[in-house]
Amino acid sequence: GSRLSEETIDKPKPMVEVGLKPIIWHIMKLYSYYGFNEFIICAGYKSSYIKSYFNEYMMNLHDITFDFKKNLKTYHKKKVDPWNVTIVDTGLNTNTGGRIKKIKNFLGDDDNFFMTYGDGVGDINIKKLLDNHLKSNKIGTVTAVLPKAKYGTLNFNLKGKLDSFKEKPQGEGGWVNGGFFVLNKKIFKYIENDRTIFEHEPLNSLAKKNQLNVYFHKDFWQSMDTLRDKNYLNQLLENNKADWQVWEKNKK
């Protein structure tokens, strides 16, 4: 499928919508379901778009009354996401490692923090991911996932007869980085400057020093790199097969 270039002309990739909500919203809902509600967004390209979205979030979510006489506005929907969202402009051309370094002063007192890409969803159990990281006593934990193959596979026998056809089987391509990390603050020692690509020097250094733990996630995961990926996620939503929406599946 073609890249998301048309979608990202006027908005950053995490703001591309799946089911009328930005993909970053879906990611935040996953964390919130597991009780994690403090978010720091590393903004760069079109950062004002992200700021505007969250600035208007309450207004767009609720019925609202404007009292012009008293200069008041009242929201009329009871349930609100208990989120605390900090948006940090980390620069237009900063690489992934540099972006992480720029939010260092916004982190709380905990020794560890989550770091997640803004273009993929999954039904990752965030609490199990954290527990796995803490038990490892390592600086970083990466979630390994088994993406669906992009094409169906044909299996032939020795005589060239077609034995079976698998429609885009799960995990045919092997384990890949799913973009859901837990990091100890010691990671900042491994990030040199704005040009540091997190997936290169820092992660390779951790791996060489046996400081990179892996959490294996065998269930649903899907990145959104292309228009086809976006359409696939929307199709899953329409057919009530959005496995990443654990907050909907497990409503009491």
PLM feature segments, named:
Residues 1-52, 56-57, 87:
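N-terminal glycine-rich phosphate-binding loop and ensuing alpha1 helix
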Residues 9, 19, 36, 108-109, ...:
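Short conserved AdoMet
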Residues 15, 153-156, 203, 214:
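A structural signal for short hydrophobic beta-strand segments in well-ordered beta-sheet cores
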Residues 37-39, 112, 139-140, 211:
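Residues at the starts of beta-strands that form the adenosine-phosphate
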Residues 49-157:
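Conserved beta-loop-beta/alpha segment of the NTase-like Rossmann-fold superfamily
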Residues 111-114, 121, 126-134, 146-149, ...:
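Catalytic-core segments of class I nucleotidyltransferases/pyrophosphorylases
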